[in-house]
Amino acid sequence: MSSLSAYRQGHSFQKSMKIFMSGLEASGEFWDITKLVPKFKYILCSFYYLKDDIFQEIKRKSDLLIIDSGAHSFQKGKKVDWVEYTKKYADWIEKNDSPQIVGYFEMDVDNLIGYEKVLELRKILEAKSNKIIPVWHKNRGIEDFKKMCQDYSGKVIAITGFKNEDIKDEQYLMFVKYAKKYSCKVH
């Protein structure tokens, strides 16, 4: 059963799920697309690919935005100064934050630098915004997921779903139900 099917079994879709379109900012046809599409609803952008003029156009045409750190883009062999990149991302967040932006994903690169370092990077981001979205990974353990829901009660959290490596589709409902207990919205 897919995560969508599991979610449907336990929840009504009326006003409960927003689907964010992604990849627009990295498209070579961005300006052509924006000429054809007068309004976007929900957009997820990667900080890694964002250029200021493209961001301003997406922001102008969108109801809501979520910004990804772009950390996953680096997992293809590039050497990165994670602290420097995070500071640059944090400064961009401070400069560009608006009510229209739902949140900003943390630097969830546990597999590269370890969870303790990720927590240090999260502090850099949280010093600039209270809309940082923590991303739970299996290596963090179930107790960390529960603590994350409690600590971020009423906010947006994320559960990694990349290639079903961390949790299986049929397990998502259990995570979503637990997060809902703390009024967390789940990406």
What is the predicted function of each stretch?
Residues 3-120:
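Non-catalytic, usually N-terminal nucleic-acid engagement modules in DNA/RNA processing proteins
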